[in-house]
A protein has these predicted regions:
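Short beta-strand-loop
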Residues: 97-136, 213-226
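DG-centered beta-turn motif at the end of beta-strands
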Residues: 64, 157, 169-183, 194, ...
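Second-shell loop/turn segments in exported
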Residues: 62-72, 104, 120-121, 136-147, ...
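Acidic, polar low-complexity linker/tail segments
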Residues: 23-60, 66-75, 195
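Von Willebrand factor
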Residues: 53-118, 129-176, 203-216, 220, ...
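VWA/integrin I-like adhesion module and closely mimicked acidic/polar interface patches used
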Residues: 94, 179-227
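C-terminal "exit" segments of structured domains
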Residues: 238-294
């Protein structure tokens, strides 16, 4: 089941002490070559399992840097992630897991062929490693790029899980953005491919500006994220509608993801899979075609 949560609906105490634990996505199966090796060496699979560093979650932070984001928003977004990672609440949530550590990578995205890894896979297991990741996020120059391809971000993220040396109880892609997909393949195709791999996708739709006909903004970006972007056991959306609560929203979402919990007080359940989405999942492509004819 997928849920939407507004800022303030989740308190730190609830994240750490209350609510039901989200469904755990099974780790991706070993590749065919590894499976063949294990069939010839019965002890190999067990040995590999013990040798692989275990973490509570493999977390990919996929951050929109398209031109629809203004420079202030990009700066606040960066600061929000950096401050959340070093916050007392985050570090406390980190220690609540069975392994007391997570693996995280952070990349920025725009068009379907435009993704840039800012933080390669790192383990966060306490204040020192959290500080190192936060500092690395902040020291990288802010950039902007054209087009918005959520599908491209998901497709770029999926193989990153298989390339990292860690083994998590959950695999989560955390997508933030301020507009619908308008480039690359359909977002639902990418989303469904991720779900099939046991990956959970959570969303952070940014709605701090009034939609304008001259832009790619849409009125119900939160519905779009709920119905077209997020998916997997316990998937949820945290919507930002107030610039002043930008950083709070990021911290709330990261706390939930690290603690492996769904929001305590879900506000609006996502539309059932058998029903039509409340917003067309191709609305971004349609707007682009109507305005620019390509």
């Amino acid at each position: 089941m997928r849920w939407y949560v507004s800022i303030g609906a989740v308190l730190v105490a609830g994240v750490l002490a209350g609510g039901d634990v989200a469904g755990v996505a099974a780790p991706s199966p070993q590749n065919q070559f590894s499976s063949q090796l294990s069939s010839f060496a019965p002890g190999r699979q067990s040995a590999d399992k013990e040798a692989t560093p275990s973490v509570d979650v493999e977390l990919i932070l996929a951050v929109d840097v398209s031109y629809s984001m203004d420079m202030d928003e990009l700066a606040i977004q960066r600061e929000g992630y950096a401050q959340a990672i070093v916050s007392r609440e985050f570090l406390q949530a980190l220690k609540s897991g069975p392994n007391g550590k997570i693996a995280v990578t952070y990349f920025e995205w725009a068009a379907s062929s435009d993704q840039k890894i800012i933080i390669p896979w790192r383990v966060i297991d306490g204040p020192e490693t959290a500080d190192a990741v936060a500092n690395e996020i902040m020291k990288t120059p802010i950039r902007r790029a054209s087009r918005t391809s959520i599908s491209g971000a998901i497709n770029f993220a999926m193989p990153l899980f298989d390339e990292n040396p860690y083994r998590g109880l959950r695999r989560v892609i955390d997508i933030s953005g301020d507009g619908p997909n308008n480039n690359g393949g359909p977002v639902v195709v990418a989303r469904d491919a991720a779900i099939e791999k046991g990956i959970v996708i959570n969303g952070l739709p940014i709605m701090v500006k009034e939609p304008s006909y001259s832009t790619m903004d849409i009125d119900n970006l939160d519905f779009y994220y709920e119905d077209c972007v997020i998916g997997g056991p316990g998937a949820f959306v945290v919507t930002i509608k107030d610039r002043e609560k930008f950083k709070e929203a990021i911290r709330t979402k990261l706390l939930l993801e690290v603690a492996g919990r769904t929001p305590e007080r879900p506000v609006v359940p996502a539309v059932a899979a058998s029903k039509e989405p409340r917003v067309s999942c191709l609305i971004g492509e349609k707007i682009w075609q109507d305005r620019w004819g390509r």
